[in-house]
Amino acid sequence: MVLSTKRVAWVLVLAAAAPSALAAPKKVSGGDQRQEVSITVYNQNFGLVREVREIEVGTGTVDLEFRDVAAQIQPQTVSIKSLSGANALSVLEQNYRYDLLTPQKLLEKHVGKKVRVWRWNEKLGKDEPFDAEVLSVAGGQTVMKIGGEVTYNFPGRIAFQSVPENLMSKPTLVWKLESKLAKQKVEATYLTQSLNWRSDYVFVINDADSAGDLTGWVTLINNSGASYKNARLKLVAGDVQRVSDGDDHRRPMGGAARMSANRERQFSEESFFEYHLYTLSQPTDVLENEQKQVTLLEAKGAKVQKKLIYFGQQYWYRSKYGEVQKNQKVGVYLDLQNTKDNGLGMPLPKGTVRVYKADKSGAKQFIGEDNIDHTPRDEKVRIKMGEAFDVVGDRKQMEWRTLGACTSESTWEIELRNHKDQASRVEIYEPIGGDWTMVESTHKHDKKDAHTFTFDVNVPANGKTKIKYKVRVKWC
């Protein structure tokens, strides 16, 4: 038998199984029967789906196929109840079928069975049919018996008479129900993975670095394997405890996501348990493989304070340290007060703040970004912008001596140099361990906590400032 070298063309000829072949008639409910849908999305990559459908269930013991659920559903979290009566519906059995129809699965289900194959006949100038038996599909290669020969990688197309009953085109919940009403309004709820949201903030500051306009966006990512049209949307901000069961059938969802944006719809916020709940004011479409952005907040002229901070290290006080730490970087930060007086005063979900500033031509330039944690109202937000280019520092240990088995005394000198044409204010943060005492210093220090003291110094334009201090540390 001579086989053509033409590329394999997969053609699946699918014929629906006759109802008479089924063990019992099944009731089917699809997404087109949804009357209500709401989703609550958590910023830990999962969500709660609640939907209401009106279904012709029938009475007695019935099988219901509940289709168009999320592909990333956690079936052990599913709950169903009737809204038509307290005892109108009871669940006898629940199954989740996710053995999905693919060319490979179709072949696997036909191992040991007959199929029809077609190959190109050069002499006839058309495809020629043959009966074949599928022997194996192991390793992704199809082995078949055609006539008296066994072959693999057949260069043609394969046709199947029908789809095996246990292969589903979409993930489907199947319930065996005891129904007392023929037509019922049914509510189903479940958790699904791959629904996520995050906050993205855009902060445009003024020329003086003293204020700016802050816009907060909710970015919703739906890779759950389902679309939710005209859905009521709620978001939960907070760290919700979850348990991993270690038994996850779900597949990773790939593909590029579409992006849509809406600046008009706004969220209302409320405290909920020990978290915060944000509710979108009107329904929205959350489509499969989509990123949607909705405005969370807008604050005009929010005051901000730029800070230059120079950090030390705890371990420097434990031993003699001979090396000079030269040209150490000075961090640049923006401090923003989350208060009503500052145009904010609402719980800020964790997310990324991206900061922009206009140059002399008026064009906005990106100047830094940082992640912020969940921030309650009336708390400070600190944004790390980067490191100063023109302000640097040196640190060196001038003296070090032991005063006992676990007590030492050391003298340090910090030199800050400012290469800008205007003065700069720099905060020096000195973390220190053990039981410590400031013996002497050239500048006033501030004890922030048990293990931190600071200096707040002015560094003149194109000049330098030296700070010298002696500290005694007991660590046992």
Segments and roles (model prediction):
Residues 2-7, 16-476:
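Long, intrinsically disordered, low-complexity accessory segments associated with secretion
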